[in-house]
Amino acid sequence: KRVSDEKLYGDNDLVDEKHLARHCIGLSGIGFSDEEIEDLADRIREMKKKDTQICCSIGFLTEKQARILKDAGLDRINHNLNSSRSFYPEICTTHTYDQRVNNIKMLQSLGFEICSGGIVGMGESKEDIVDMLMDLREINPESVPINFLLPIPGTKLADRDISELTPEYCMKVLCLA
């Protein structure tokens, strides 16, 4: 569903008013049409009039689509690895871990800053966490968000036991990152 211009630009005014460094646009879905990308590019150009850094969580892009957004002024893209290569098939069946890594590398080659991290608490092992962090080190993103699972009713991980996610455990993971 397309967010209204009023909401999007109103949020951008707030970023400017509060002197925040960046405005992040989060989108959901797998793949966007060229028309949707052009629409987003127009909106980014409008937002850039505020001298605000723009970040977008948009999923997979073609190189053509990424260039359109780069030319519009998009600064940073969030594309998380989410997990380790070996655990990834347990949480995602629509695409592969390598597709995520390749998408990030393509975006980096076009000059985007990258925000990429993962989610802890989905049933992965400690070795999986270390493997994900080592892959992130190789990718070398500008920002590494580490998220901790909060099970949501109605989702695949709704019944996941997160008792291991104590404050101490979470701090250890963050220290490794």
Protein language model features and the residues they cover:
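Short, small-residue-enriched loops and turns at beta-alpha junctions
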Residues: 29-34, 94, 120-125, 152, ...
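Core AdoMet radical
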Residues: 1-9, 15-103, 113-117, 142-147
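Conserved C-terminal portion of the radical SAM core fold
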Residues: 25, 49-51, 98-156, 170-177
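Glycine-rich, acidic and aromatic/proline-enriched surface loops and short helix-turn segments
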Residues: 73-76, 169, 173
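Generic long, charged, amphipathic alpha-helical segments
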Residues: 162-170
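Short, well-ordered secondary-structure micro-motifs
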Residues: 67, 90, 126-128, 155-163
